[in-house]
Amino acid sequence: MIDQKVIVALDYDNQADALAFVDRIDPASCRLKVGKEMFTLFGPDFVRELHKRGFSVFLDLKFHDIPNTCSKAVRAAAELGVWMVNVHASGGERMMTASREILEPYGKDRPLLIGVTVLTSMEQSDLAGIGLDVAPQEQVIRLATLTKNSGLDGVVCSAQESSLLKNELGKEFKLVTPGIRPAGSEQGDQRRIMTPVDAIQAGSDYLVIGRPITQAADPASVLKSINDSLASM
């Protein structure tokens, strides 16, 4: 099976609307991301509905807690059968290691475990506001290195950091990049953005794209256009 690069961010507050959108696209063309709002509103059964339709799911809940609590949440995600789950790297090495170790019994069926470095909406002034006197890129490198040393599969990072992280941490370390906007799209609330082709060329492995697809008149066509552009690289 082709390793789909595009992860469509489902940001709906109505389950019927979300499923109506999902039914317009092909599981062979993308994966789906379910975040905090949808999971809180609709719960695990919504993820199961997506699985029934043949989609792989990135459960984007950014767990951040004491090691025992965080690892049990990660295990619950594995039991749900998701393809990818994430934790905040700022939770530290013990938390991330516990989360990785609890997945070992699942073998090849375990989800990818990804660390969250610096949220793409954050600028240097935001980091200063929480007591971190560092540039976003410096903090990303620090947390990504900690994530790799903890044995996780990769990190969420902006496309601007992808090239640097690939060079620093190796080709096998997966980079999941939000803030992706096909050419001509509005910037939205992501501060550090890039086009799909640019992001893959920079070293990103998976691209999270939301409104440019979910709000398109013909989302299947937009997906095809993006995938075609990536295939022609």
Swiss-Prot record:
Reading the lineage from the top rank, the first entry is: Bacteria
Active site per the UniProt annotation = K62
Q: Cite the InterPro entries for this sequence.
A: Aldolase_TIM, OMPdecase, OMPdecase_AS, OMPdecase_bac, OMPdeCOase_dom, RibuloseP-bd_barrel
Q: Name one GO molecular function term.
A: orotidine-5'-phosphate decarboxylase activity
Listed SUPFAM superfamilies? Ribulose-phoshate binding barrel
Q: Which SMART domains is this protein grouped with?
A: OMPdecase
Alphabetized CDD domains for the sequence? OMP_decarboxylase_like (cd04725)
Taken from the record, one Pfam family name reads: OMPdecase
Q: What is its EC number?
A: 4.1.1.23
Q: What is this protein called?
A: Orotidine 5'-phosphate decarboxylase
- What species was this sequence derived from? Vibrio campbellii (strain ATCC BAA-1116)
Starting at the broadest rank, the lineage of the source organism is: Bacteria, Pseudomonadati, Pseudomonadota, Gammaproteobacteria, Vibrionales
